[in-house]
């Protein structure tokens, strides 16, 4: 299950970041077509480093790291 902070691989062939890794910045729950915002290290030709994707266009590579428990 993709969640905020997950490392994901992009499966959309027409995307600049096809087969690249990115980090999930947020997930919109309102029912839009491309609810997952993914942030990347490198920028595209327009200088943008984020893009929206559908859940089925992403494969989770690494789950987000757990936060340490508060004392």
From Swiss-Prot:
Q: Which Gene3D superfamilies match?
A: 2.30.30.50
| Pfam families linked to this entry | PSI_PsaE
Q: Subcellular localization, per the record? A: Cellular thylakoid membrane
> Membrane topology type, per the record?
Peripheral membrane protein
Top-rank taxon of the source lineage equals: Bacteria
Family the entry assigns: Belongs to the PsaE family.
Q: What does this protein do?
A: Stabilizes the interaction between PsaC and the PSI core, assists the docking of the ferredoxin to PSI and interacts with ferredoxin-NADP oxidoreductase.
> What protein is this chain from?
Photosystem I reaction center subunit IV
- Originating species: Nostoc punctiforme (strain ATCC 29133 / PCC 73102)
For this protein's source organism, the top of the classification is:
Bacteria, Bacillati, Cyanobacteriota, Cyanophyceae, Nostocales
Q: Which gene encodes it?
A: psaE
């Amino acid at each position: 299950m993709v969640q905020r902070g997950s490392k994901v691989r992009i499966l959309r062939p027409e995307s600049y970041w096809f087969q690249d890794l990115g980090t999930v910045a947020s997930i919109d729950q309102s029912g839009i077509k491309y609810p997952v915002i993914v942030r990347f290290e490198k920028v595209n030709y327009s200088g943008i480093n984020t893009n929206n994707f559908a859940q089925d266009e992403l494969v989770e590579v690494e789950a987000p790291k757990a936060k340490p428990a508060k004392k």
